């Protein structure tokens, strides 16, 4: 099993007192499997992704990723897992304005010490970005920038891809096209994909679907 989440809890302190965002979440994901995570705003979807991605730590429970217990790691260990094992795509593209598209795509792979020029070129080609490689992010449309962000995430060949509304800034038809491309490329790498989405149409493109309600899997 690529990912096993067991009895995960997370509580934040608010002005009104403690707020339990996650209240004992369990899930599993196999290598090569795609899973949609749906739910209302505030149900804990993004928090769950942040915990799995090592961007935050749970109050209790376990996250075992690729044989490593993330909850037993320190900050440096979680950072290493983010570089070497996990790829993250957010709704905001967060491309580097001063870098050409070719270098934006290769950026994460170079940080991880896993840069493969041929694979980056393949990603650019499959995403329809080859004509844009010498351009800068500001010269691309929103849909093109999101394709760059996805290619950048896949460039290091992560074992697990976490996607938080990765096509949220796109219209429904374009979003479906971009997700289809992303699913093809994820399948080529054998990675697992866990995606947060509000779209029933996009969730339907995934192999499995889980629904979060008030911090629990419904």
Task: Go through the PLM ranges and name each one.
Residues 2-3, 8-212:
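ABC family nucleotide-binding domain
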Residues 214-218:
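Conserved switch/coupling elements of ABC/ABC-like ATPase nucleotide-binding domains
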